[in-house]
Amino acid sequence: MCYSARVQQHLRALARRFGAEIDWPVFEQFFERRLQDVGLKVARALERNFDAPATDVERRIHARIQAYRQTIATKWETDLFRQKKRLADAQRSLQEKETKKARDDERIATSKIEDYLERLGTLRSSDALEGDDRVFPRYFVPIVIREGGRLLIRPMRYQCRLAGKPATYDERYPGTYNARRDNLEGFWSDVYGTQHGVMVVNSFYENVANHVFERRELAPDEKPKNLVLHFNPQPPLEMLVACLWSHWTHKSDPDLYSFAAVTDDPPLLRTH
């Protein structure tokens, strides 16, 4: 099943291609909400739409993105300081006596320091980086939909929570970022045929068991191993991925627009 993709997220390019309107109010609401819930995720490619704001709404969104980055940077800098202290304490302890705990603390702190420095460098970089357009489940992605007779581009979460279902469905059904074709008239019947959208994808990634990829049975005592397949058309080609979407509402929670990509087994895994 597709678990990650590199997605076209240039909003004005999408608007021109599909003759669609950008749903600015929903984009603004999303970036405002992210200030309160820093766990909401987007790819850097989506944020880049607001690097050089030209309208009032773009300037407001740009300000929210900058405020979010400052909040995240402050948190990571605090965590970085803690790990540096942990490393220094471990190294002092090792000078006095070799212990497993001190050696583990040194190793873990060193790894985390490198990780936080890399994160902060990426956060502060103004350069376009490889993978800026890559999304994963629960990322918010621009999707082209038809609503009220209009084509709209709207940010939606890449894991669909169907309207009327409890929020606990996110954990109960973690695979709902994909909508299998053989279940469209079952689990997805509430939105299939009525609430469709399109995601523009440049390449995508599949998780596959290694023995399945090699078209063989597991050997005795062999444990399944995961293999990540990258489907990357050459020459480069934009693929239109059909999606199902839903607008979830609750009296005590923010509205949620979310979607699932319609998928099937990749061709190399099909048995017929």
Locate the predicted segments by residue.
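Short linear sequence motif anchored by a di-proline
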Residues: 1-272
